[in-house]
């Protein structure tokens, strides 16, 4: 694969944004944003949008960053297009103190960094997409934290596009709505976005996938919380009386179709994920 030239503005923004901790907190999912730190990046982005000439750039009380870019001359009658990315990062690994660095990848295992003297690496077996990236410069964390490319890569791309439009008025484009939303990782995302004020006929979420891939449908899911209550009895006197809540859960899990799990499904096939 030929080395891809990266837009310096995208790279600079990405390296800067990932160093701002924005982890959402599932334990606080009853409030939006679930973590106050998401305002840190939200305020930075709103200010940068204002500097780039975006209209009505602001941060809502729920940490949504919203702004609009007028259509270029001659494109005023085109449908408004929305571009969306999310501020927060997942809780699956530490998100504060991210130290991004660039690794020139030559193939094989990708070593991001070290933890306790041991290399932190990703293999092509676990991440087949690496096979298409030999010869590329890849941004990695130092191995002690997540990187936050999901979705600060999308944030950086959208911001760089806004900057490019601001610098070159000859670029044709419809009216654009920009939104950076909180708490996507815990199931909220665009939940509290004012669609009418956003004012876009169509919108795309810039979040992951290989270069050139465009998806025109949305993933859809529903969530349920199931509570299992047992009866605690001393094991020596438990016959006919003890109810093990853990076993109830196992029985429940066994009722779900085994092959309808994420590891066995693809495409339009639905799945159950506990």
Features from the language model and the residues they span:
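A non-catalytic alpha/beta surface segment that caps or lines the substrate-entry region
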Residues: 29-78, 82-84, 88, 99
């Amino acid at each position: 694969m030929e080395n891809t030239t990266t837009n310096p503005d995208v790279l600079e923004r990405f390296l800067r944004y990932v160093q701002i901790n924005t982890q959402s907190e599932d334990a606080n999912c009853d409030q939006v944003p679930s973590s106050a730190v998401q305002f840190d990046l939200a305020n930075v982005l709103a200010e940068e949008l204002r500097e780039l000439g975006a209209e009505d750039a602001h941060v809502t009380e729920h940490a949504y960053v919203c702004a609009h870019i007028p259509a270029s001359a001659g494109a005023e009658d085109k449908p408004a297009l929305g571009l969306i990315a999310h501020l927060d990062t997942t809780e699956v690994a530490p998100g504060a103190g991210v130290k991004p660095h660039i690794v020139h990848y030559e193939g094989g295992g990708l070593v991001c960094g070290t933890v306790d003297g041991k290399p932190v690496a990703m293999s092509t077996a676990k991440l087949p997409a690496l096979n298409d990236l030999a010869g590329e410069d890849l941004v990695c964390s130092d191995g002690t934290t997540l990187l936050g490319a999901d979705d600060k890569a999308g944030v950086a791309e959208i911001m760089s596009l806004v900057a490019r439009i601001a610098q070159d008025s000859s670029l044709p484009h419809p009216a654009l709505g920009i939104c950076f939303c909180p708490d996507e990782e815990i199931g909220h995302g665009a939940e509290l976005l004012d669609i009418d004020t956003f004012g876009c006929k169509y919108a795309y979420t810039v979040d992951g996938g290989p270069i050139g891939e465009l998806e025109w449908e949305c993933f859809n899911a529903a969530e349920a919380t199931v509570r299992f209550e047992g009866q605690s009895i001393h094991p020596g006197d438990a016959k006919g009386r003890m109810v093990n809540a853990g076993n109830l859960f196992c029985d429940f899990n066994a009722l779900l179709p085994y092959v309808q799990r994420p590891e066995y499904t693809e495409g339009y096939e639905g799945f159950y994920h506990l």
